[in-house]
Amino acid sequence: MPVVTLYWDELERLVGADRDTILSRLPMLGCDIERVEDDHVDVEFFPNRPDLYSVEGVARALRGFLGIEKGLKSYSAVKGEWKITVEESVLAVRPRIVGCVVKGIRMTDEVIRSLMEVQEDLHWTIGRNRRKMAIGVHDLSKVYFPLRYKAVDANFSFVPLDFDREMTVAEILEEHPKGKAYAFILEGKDSYPMIVDSKDEVISFPPIINAEKTRVTEETTDLFIDVTGFDENVDRAIAILACMLADRGGRIESVEVVYPDHVELTPNLDVRFMEVDVDEVNSLLGLSLSAEEIKESLEKMRFSCEIEGEKLKVGIPPYRADIMHEWDVIEDVAIGYGYENITPEIPPTLTFGRTHPWNDIRSLAKEIMIGLGFTEVITFTLTNEAVMYEKMRRKGEPWKDYVPVMHPLTTEHTILRTSLLPKLLELLSYNKHHEMPQMVFEVGDVVVNSKNRLHLAACITHSRANFSEIRSYVQAVMRELDLTWEVRESDDEAFIDGRRAEIVVDGKAVGVFGEVHPEVLEGFELTMPVSAFEIDLSAFFDTGELL
């Protein structure tokens, strides 16, 4: 989780309260105070509140929480004469771009420091280390509109930030510090995203580095900000940055982004509205709050609220992209009301618990795998059909017995996983630039036919990963689990024919192992061989083997 450094002189001035008051109330917003020094405080915030990664965002929240300035703060973008044209060539590389212009900013050391820190924190969290989203900040006076967002080849050249000579894209990825750090994002690509202005001069090479010519200095008063990526994370980031700089007195102007098939006006600073039921609030929190008390709590959390009988019409500020459900609003009601004001109650009945057998086998499996030299990872339970089936060459039963997500917010999270292996391969693809060999495993739930199953999966990748190696690890796992097993031929298309096998216990297939098929490796953009196995641990409870 990101740790944000907040300097006392600036924080006290922006909030309008003394440090003792701030220190006593800050943890109530949902953060941990890591360190308190004479000139600053280090605060760790949860990843679900990226709007709090800057001193401006924290001050905004505290002013409401302390009752200094309650309710929804209005933000708007003036329609500007700024335009970005997105060319067809870049859509297959990094398809989304948004932008905004900020005028009238005094770029003091404090503002520059805050902007750089929030930029990197956003890169690390919602940007997934720039893979999903990357931000560029430029001196507007050096940018000549209209801009073009296009793809170029590796021989394209410009002067990157912190250099005084032209470098080709290939040279930047091999020699520039930022290029070497983030080259993995574009690995395997034969074209690269580039933002150029009307003079055909480069503004930015996202997600790697800006051009030297648009460097921001203390003399800068007007900014152009671009955010590139793949999904709605670019909209979240630009809204957070625009609101942050508006709080510094900046005038926000919109940028028109022209795609081949549609036009967008960014940033979108519109207020979203959500209906919240008073009874649902009290039922979930175990309280008996009136509509007026709920409204008071929400206004302290910087929402607007209108009472409409037993319903509340809640206005959500543009920087709160974490609010996706009625319960998210109710959580903020609890924070605004004050957890310290909620009286703990002893349950009316007393029961004694014990660990679930699944947790016992989960712990044992982890102990075995760590002892074999594997590194444990935890991947998302939500995934999509492309990762789970298409890239794995898997069709039909049982791989289609998945649970879909109703009204998914992104195309990446449309179903619950039915197998652990695809997510491990996806993880390896993100880490292929690291040293080999790589040995990873996961013990986790999958959902098949609407029922949870406990699986163990592992992958090995290096230049000589093979069937014999992965079989030796399967043998070790089954020996440590004290299970008698045998091997029979598998027809799992994710593995190479003749180098794949089923794990059979009491005549029932409980797992599979082998060398991953080259087409699967290509789908995940993996360049090294991979051998893998997956075992359904819950099958042993079905048969009584591990009870």
Swiss-Prot record:
Main location: cytoplasm
Signal peptide: none
GO CC annotation, single: phenylalanine-tRNA ligase complex
Enzyme class: ligase
Family statement drawn from the similarity comment of this UniProt entry: Belongs to the phenylalanyl-tRNA synthetase beta subunit family. Type 2 subfamily.
Cofactors that this protein relies on: Mg(2+)
EC number: 6.1.1.20
Domain B5 span(s) in chain numbering: 269-344
Catalytic activity field: tRNA(Phe) + L-phenylalanine + ATP = L-phenylalanyl-tRNA(Phe) + AMP + diphosphate + H(+)
HAMAP family, A to Z: Phe_tRNA_synth_beta2 (MF_00284)
Database matches in SMART domains: B3_4 (SM00873), B5 (SM00874)
Keywords carried by this UniProt record: Aminoacyl-tRNA synthetase, ATP-binding, Cytoplasm, Ligase, Magnesium, Metal-binding, Nucleotide-binding, Protein biosynthesis
Single GO molecular function: RNA binding
Compartments (UniProt record): Cytoplasm
Species annotation: Archaeoglobus fulgidus (strain ATCC 49558 / DSM 4304 / JCM 9628 / NBRC 100126 / VC-16)
Primary gene name: pheT
Matches recorded under CDD domains: PheRS_beta_core (cd00769)
The protein, known as: Phenylalanine--tRNA ligase beta subunit
